[in-house]
């Protein structure tokens, strides 16, 4: 998503994200492409399915998503106990990284976060207020270096105007949450499991796709290993 100059945009593919996970010290998980949300194809996805990262055209989707979050707030169903932070404008085009970090942070009991760059930031981020976490991230030179090294290894030409946004769908203690760094809070979407997360998330994703007249969507599943 577009923003101030800062961290470069990561490509939304496993060839980029999996090496980045290693650079920041995380193991026990890998990204795989999700090519379709049709039931007959989803059955071939590996398990356990821990999270799903979605990339989509930002400007077309923002109005629709805003209405979804307004409905959650109206109904008083804002969740508690979910790690969340808003995107810091100083970081710039790193909404893909926010989606990935939201996934990892809410799966800390399912993954090996190691003792590396992500773990060191996360241990500090858990102790500060929600609105201070992205500032803490923007000040983390170790993560910024690993992030930009990975971005520079990609094939896509960098631009300050990136009109795509990333959000994640995470299984947190058997409940599915949509986490968007540009939204006011995580959105609860009901029950889920390690075998059905992508299918469960596809309900919300298909609704989003139907309301956006643009087919430029891509998705990656985070699979435990």
What is each of the regions a protein language model found here?
Residues 1-225:
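Cysteine-dependent deubiquitinase/ubiquitin-like isopeptidase catalytic cores across multiple families
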